[in-house]
Amino acid sequence: MIQGERLWQRLMELGEVGKQPSGGVTRLSFTAEERRAKDLVASYMREAGLFVYEDAAGNLIGRKEGTNPDATVVLVGSHLDSVYNGGCFDGPLGVLAGVEVVQTMNEHGVVTHHPIEVVAFTDEEGARFRFGMIGSRAMAGTLPPEALECRDAEGISLAEAMKQAGLDPDRLPQAARKPGTVKAYVELHIEQGRVLEEAGLPVGIVTGIAGLIWVKFTIAGPAEHAGATPMSLRRDPMAAAAQIIIVIEEEARRTGTTVGTVGQLHVYPGGINVIPERVEFVLDLRDLKAEVRDQVWKAIAVRAETIAKERNVRLTTERLQEMAPVLCSEVVKQAAERACKQLGYPPFWLPSGAAHDGVQLAPICPIGMIFVRSQDGVSHSPAEWSTKEDCAVGAEVLYHTVWQLAQGE
């Protein structure tokens, strides 16, 4: 039933908004590029027969009424913002597939008991203000007031950017949904990994979203001459950092489920011929079970302290962020499982290592996700790609999942 070609054409058209010379997409929140993207998607929503509006957080919403307009709403969507020089599938696939689902329903005269709303959430990525999931936090009523003071690289605060975009930060609480008004939230998203590709499958059903902790390590010692300081006398923070990073890899591997990453490292003063006086790096540690993740962190912390003592360097750690894992709803997973079977695809279960808006919505409603195969597992890159055929399959599974949820009492 889904028109895969229409979905693909819209994905490609939206991918031109914010396109960079590299071929990547930069579409940050509350910018002209995001406004153009919202306007384009709003036109798709109207074409699909939806009532279109934006809430106080700037979330773009298209509503299809149900036979009972007072029934709880089924939400389906994702986000339109991107990272710097990202891809054109991360986020937009979920929004545009949601539009395709309700447009297909309307074109075939399909009515549902529950209303359906397609949502394009504001600033999921957090690339501009280094604080993400603003729209979904606002909808859940959990956006902290201090988030409005987060600033971008040019010193513009989130509150100022909202005002520039025509929004009133003081009205943000109005975006919160009342308890008991949302039946479920379903999101179609690219996997951003290689699990489905290795399994040879176009789609998978997400079991849960991993919880993360970010920990900043600072290791300090004396800055000394690289040539004049014998190896036996060195107190080298860089060598200690390298050893600790190997420990992170070792401890994460032990569980079979935990992932540990150091993707950011700064060395001071940064001279070729200077033993560093300070090294800073940030650990990203994730697991679907908080207790497993926390056990891994404790093991890393103990071994890191031992390394620091043995090397006679100073070690401090600071927890920057923590996010609890969220398990997907059995009701949503079962609906997605039935959809896969109906379409002839074996149900394949996998966790999401990346965070998504559903994490924020979980306190107010059951959530679920469907993944589409990513080519080579690449994401947050101009090389991000999922095939037209896989996107269409994902949209079909989404259609049958949403239909089940919207028909039930």
Swiss-Prot record:
Disulfide bonds: none annotated. It catalyses: an N-carbamoyl-L-alpha-amino acid + H2O + 2 H(+) = an L-alpha-amino acid + NH4(+) + CO2; N-carbamoyl-L-methionine + H2O + 2 H(+) = L-methionine + NH4(+) + CO2; N-acetyl-L-methionine + H2O = L-methionine + acetate; N-carbamoyl-L-alanine + H2O + 2 H(+) = L-alanine + NH4(+) + CO2. Residues 208-325 are annotated as: Involved in dimerization. The keyword Oxidoreductase does not apply. One of its GO terms (molecular function) is N-carbamoyl-L-amino-acid hydrolase activity. The record marks R234 as: Necessary for dimerization. A divalent metal cation 1 binds at H79, D90, H189. This is N-carbamoyl-L-amino acid amidohydrolase. An N-carbamoyl-L-alpha-amino acid binds at Q192, H225, N273, R286, A355.
